[in-house]
Amino acid sequence: MSAATLIATKPTGTGPFAKFAARPLVVALITLALITAARVNGRVDSDVAWQLWIAGRIHAGANLYTDIVETNPPLWFWMAVPVERLAALLDVRIESLLILAVGFITALSLAATDRLALHIEPIRRGLLLAYAAIVLAAMPWMHVGQREQIVLITTLPYAALVASRREERSVSALTAASIGVGAALGFALKQYFLLVPAILELWLLAGQRRGWRAIRPETLALVAVGISYAAAIAFIEPDFITRIVPLIRLAYGVFGAPGIQYLFGPFAIVGLLLLGALSLRFRVLAGRSTPIASAMAVAAVAFALVYFIQFKGWPYHTIPLIGCASIALASLLAEGKETPPWLRVFAHALFILPLVLSAEEELNPALPSPDLLNAVSGLRAGESVAFLTTETAIPWSVTLQGHYRYASRYNGFWMMRAIIRNEHSPNPDPRLTALGRQIASDTARDFACIPPQRIIVTRPRPGESTFDTLPFFLRDRSFASLLSHYRVRSRTSLETYELASPFPAASSGCRKGV
């Protein structure tokens, strides 16, 4: 029997299974515990590895946005600092502790949602929450700890709360405020995510009309967290505003999907299929009989807009779209009085498909590639390594995992695309020209302060038209002089240089905490 059939059919009976299934939150938490236990010794993706590394450098005294160049706002990195500290105190893998922390906030999300879904009879609610646990914890398997997973986890109870408001159900101020704080922290991770509470609020306004009230515990919590976060950036990390925002405006625009076709990968197509299935039940969702399903469908539409506005096409950007749409479909079956047979069959495939894609992504990762593993083979934990690549995922699929010391202030040279395009422009922007010189100079200084045992360079193969990074850096005399101390170790899709004649590390002008 499929998950769709289980949710859509009201089980009966008084046996042990029925009694157990009648405890919805227990069923969901056991499901979550099993997933977390299976995941706890796994790896994290390159972005999360970079996040965790930064947390350690912050504790060591590095200044974010000066000693480390990062384009994202600081909240995500601040979230990782206590995880890094606790992992160091307990002497455990930081990745494992992060996975446990994500499991904990997922449990809070499920518990809050359970309190807001009491209109669904217990067995159906248990099945719905168990499926939600799978979506929140297992579907983003390879991307555990990503901002998209966190915002999905915090959106679920917030959407359920907005649904309760639309139905004028009583919710305690403490519960509403707590959900609002959690949701605010999720929405604050990216400015794009703010579109989601805005669209949910418009949906609530359309449903309540004159009965709508803007001032509620959860909206006050959203505003309070937002103001506090903005103030924290201004006073604690002003360099984000003065240094990083201008860098983003100057060079980040060309760092994205080469064309619109790249936005329609397998994960995006699954998300759109889920939205299509929901649209077939538009009349039901537009009514009052399935409030949580309706709210989650609205959130899914909002996250679809977020995905396309970002215009990157990266699979993990679809996590909240797929997650909200999947839970909306499951809620439609759980809350609905009558479920058409075709929907049960269709839902069976759509419930499973995102998990199949996630499993395929985990079993066949693009990185670390065999060439990359060969490039770092023989390096010992604590030895320094450096990369010259525009793809930030390359260094951060091995650096944290191998416990290497990272030599650069840049997680990758993504800005080179804008710099090289500018060089070929008939009217080059002098700011981008100056940025290119600064990056080469900064890199030479970083490598002089932390002499890498190996420098790994992405270079085009014969016949490829992609940009060759190394000659650009060799224009800088200091960098060229430094590279003269290295010999070529291997040439594959990556060119690896091994330190051949050691040189004394620079003693001045070096960054802190790295």
Predicted segments — roles?
Residues 110-136, 152-153, 169-170:
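Transmembrane-helix signature of polytopic, membrane-embedded enzymes
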Residues 72, 192-193, 235-238, 348-513:
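Extracytoplasmic
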Residues 40-54, 65-83, 364-368:
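Extracytoplasmic catalytic/substrate-binding loops of multi-pass membrane glycan-assembly enzymes
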Residues 5-8, 14, 196-223, 280-286, ...:
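Perimembrane helix-loop-helix junctions
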Residues 153-154, 195-196, 310-340:
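Hydrophobic/aromatic-rich transmembrane helices and adjacent perimembrane loops
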Residues 141-151, 314-315:
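Short acidic/glycine- and proline-prone juxtamembrane loop motifs at membrane-interface regions
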Residues 172-191, 197-202, 300-308:
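Membrane-interface alpha helices of multi-pass inner-membrane proteins
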